[in-house]
């Protein structure tokens, strides 16, 4: 029974500062590093052995993936990085304190931007200091593929080809898969995996820790879903 382990990146410096992050390439906080290490230890304790790992091109997810593999004694496992697993792009909200954004735009409007399935936040200008246009890690992409803002619907549309081309085939081959990604890219894939409605996915939260495990049958029907937890003494 193949397993898929989702690990949202550990707490980032901007999580700690309560800032909208999106595609901004911020680092893990000290606590986030500890969370990633603990994720690896939980994976080792659970006896889960991976055949392949996937992550985004953002350092907080890459570092979480590397630490989780290192502390589960699986640092040799191949890791594939893809922009399609990046966090949702928060557009012009990127870098703003969430409380300041609410004060400027109103609590209700910010809540809609954050939590609705298909409402886009304000677009990011191409000359914004956090723009992905011109960033070397996206040099191989057509400029039209680089977003200026995303909602969860668009995030799923971006992530879905990677699920269909990479992750799902690996699982169908019986491989155990690790995905180190982000709250909203994981939520998008969970919607696909569990066949959730647009309304149902809005109530799903993905914590920075611990990792989330799915077990599948040969047709990728979910047989079990659980968060890893320390074994009781």
From Swiss-Prot:
Xref: CDD domains: HP_PGM_like
Record's keyword terms, sorted: Gluconeogenesis, Glycolysis, Isomerase
EC supergroup of this enzyme: isomerase
Catalytic residues of the enzyme: 9, 87
Keyword Isomerase on entry: yes
Reaction(s) catalysed (UniProt annotation): (2R)-2-phosphoglycerate = (2R)-3-phosphoglycerate
Pfam families, per database record: His_Phos_1
SUPFAM superfamilies: Phosphoglycerate mutase-like
Primary role: Catalyzes the interconversion of 2-phosphoglycerate and 3-phosphoglycerate.
Protein's name in the database: 2,3-bisphosphoglycerate-dependent phosphoglycerate mutase
Organism: Lactococcus lactis subsp. cremoris (strain MG1363)
Annotated gene: gpmA
């Amino acid at each position: 029974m193949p397993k898929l382990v989702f690990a949202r990146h550990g707490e980032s410096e901007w999580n700690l500062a309560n800032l909208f992050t999106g595609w901004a390439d911020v680092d893990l906080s000290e606590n986030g590093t500890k969370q990633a290490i603990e994720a690896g230890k939980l994976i080792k304790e659970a006896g889960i052995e991976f055949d392949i790992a996937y992550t985004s091109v953002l350092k907080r997810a890459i570092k979480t993936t590397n630490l989780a593999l290192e502390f589960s004694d699986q640092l040799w496992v191949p890791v594939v990085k893809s922009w399609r697993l990046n966090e949702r792009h928060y557009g012009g909200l990127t870098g703003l304190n969430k409380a300041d954004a609410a004060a400027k735009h109103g609590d209700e409007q910010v809540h809609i931007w954050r939590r609705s399935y298909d409402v886009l936040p304000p677009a990011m200008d191409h000359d914004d200091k956090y723009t992905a246009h011109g960033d070397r890690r996206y040099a191989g992409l057509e400029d039209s593929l680089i977003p200026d803002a995303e909602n969860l619907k668009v995030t799923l549309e971006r992530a879905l080809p990677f699920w269909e081309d990479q992750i799902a085939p690996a699982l169908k081959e019986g491989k155990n898969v690790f995905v180190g990604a982000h709250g909203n890219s994981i939520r998008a894939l969970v919607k696909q995996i569990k066949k959730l409605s647009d309304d149902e996915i809005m109530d799903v939260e993905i914590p920075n820790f611990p990792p989330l495990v799915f077990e599948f049958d040969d047709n990728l029907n979910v047989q079990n879903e659980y968060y890893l937890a320390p074994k009781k003494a």
